[in-house]
Each structure stands twice: as C-alpha cells, then as structure tokens.
Amino acid sequence: MAAALRASTLFLVGFLIGVVVTRLPLSTALPILVGAIPNAWNVLDSSWRYTARTDGEVLNITYGLADRRRQSIRLDRIHAVQITQPFLWRPLGWYEVRVSVAGYGASASGKASGSTRILPVGTLAQARQFLPADAAPTYASPARAKWVSPLDYRQQTVALTGDYVIVRNGRLNRRIKAIHTSHIQELTYRRGPISQALGLATVDLDLVQGPVRMAARNLTLADATALLARLRSRQLPGLKPPR
C-alpha cells in the first residue's frame, strides 16, 4: 500500500486512466509507460517483506519480491540518517528512513553499491529509533526567509544536541536529518545575491556520497556565523587501523 501512495505510482495510475479516457495513441503512450513502469516495480520490489535487525555492531537487511536479497551494514559506517514523510503518507502516519553509508558511492553505472533504505515504511516511533534524542531548535530561518523559501521557511531549523546536528525542512514532504559532527566532511558558508540583500546565509554540511544532503538554510548572518564557528570546533575522528 505504501508503494501505491508514492507519487511515481500515482502518476502511472493516473496516466493509464488518462490513456483510456482520452484515447491517447499507443505510439505516444508506450514510451511514457516504458519509463514509468520500471520505477513503480523497483519501489514494490525493494520494499516487499522488508526486515532490518541489528546484530551487535551490524545492521542486517533482507528484502525483495522477485529475488530475496540480504545486506549487512556496519553501524559505524552509517554517517547520516534521513527520515522522510511524503505528503500522501501523512494521514496514515507513515515514515521512511534512508542513510548515507561510507563506501556506498555510486558505481560506473550510476547505482549505489548497496541499499540505503533501512525502513521503507514505518511509524514515527520506529523511525525515531535511528535518530539521536530530539532537541528544541538552536537556529531557525527568520520570517524574511519567506522571500527565498516561501513554502518551507517555517520548517527550516537546526538543532545541536550533544555531538549531533539535526536539520529539519520541508512543508509538503517533511524531512528530519541527523549526523554526528565527526562525520561532517566539510563546511561551506554561502550567500547568493538575494540572500545578501535579505541578510541571510546558508551553511552546507558536506557528507559522504549518499541520499542524505544537509544544509542549514536561510539563517540570519549572526546565526550562520555562530553555527559555522561551533561546527568548526567539532572533534574530528582519529585514524583507525583497517579492520
């Protein structure tokens, strides 16, 4: 059911109805169907009978409809976590969890070397098990940020709790992202022409390659500078011997 409520699947269903109602020529409809059907199938196949269990320092994942697949991820290689609630999932209280894993960069074919979805669909309580303890926002976008982010500016917040950074954004599709400060690769302070005129700045948190992208967007100059200073003083991990 969760797969059916994804935008790509709804598009496919709506398109098929449109083909019947409008009698769209097959020569026009076929290329669109060829592109849409594989995506809908991938969503269903990668979510079917999905289980994720921890065994010591390893997260074991099993999933698949046509072909059962198994995958093991060392917990210390999970660098960032993202909880997403698509707009259509809100009435059902469903959430999805994805992670960025060190060493899961894209291959030559453009595909990641392993699954980064560790909870295809679950409750908020289940999703929060992958996050540090929640905290009140430390920084938030001011009201004038509505000129550059009219939909999301009220939801754009950053919380610093212990050694973690938690970023929230998204009004339609809600997202919560978290990372241990030691896993931040680089920090980038940026201001575009409009942001300069509004007295705003964004701090990008550069992470390992993966689905999680983090940025403290459209903060006041004082807040962006303070956040940058605090994160620059983070404790960096020492070199570890290879396992």
Region spans (language model):
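N-terminal basic, Ser/Thr-rich segments that initiate or prime the first beta/alpha elements at protein or domain
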Residues: 1-243
